[in-house]
Amino acid sequence: MFPKIKQTSKNYNGKEIQAISMRFSNQITILVTISGKIGQMYMMTYEKSVMSPVSITGDMSTLPEIGVRTLLGGGGEDDIKSHWAQITAGQVGSLLARQQMLVRPDVRIPRVCLGLHVPWTDDNEKNGDLTVVILELVKEICF
């Protein structure tokens, strides 16, 4: 069985960020990159499986707990860029879980693998803007 593949790109501060998603039955692999390389890789797992309809609230308190595990890269423990990558991975997991619950609440939330190679900086504001761009790209290629 071949995966369903979608791709898109977006310009961010003069750099083209490319995104591709590949869906294999119950797993989604997403790559977001400026170079075609993967610098960091994260796996999102869900602590509770969602097997019955769930009411979504604005604060997303009904979402299952999401564990983010670093598979590749990640840098040092105090590296601000690594922290932003991990936060972004968690946000991607939350976005996909929420969308899955809205569309098909009776179906188990898929596993998500996220590869990132994006221009993180030491500036929290710029990293926040970059995270928004990444979430927009993910939303475009996964829904």
UniProtKB/Swiss-Prot annotation:
One of its GO terms (molecular function) is protein folding chaperone. It is found in: Cytoplasm; Nucleus. GO terms for cellular component: cytoplasm; cytosol; nucleus. The keyword Zinc-finger does not apply. GO terms for biological process: proteasome assembly. The keyword Nucleus applies. This is Uncharacterized protein C16E9.19. It comes from the Eukaryota. It comes from Schizosaccharomyces pombe (strain 972 / ATCC 24843). InterPro entries: Proteasome_assmbl_chp_3, Psm_Assembly_Chaperone. PANTHER family: PROTEASOME ASSEMBLY CHAPERONE 3. Keywords: Cytoplasm, Nucleus.
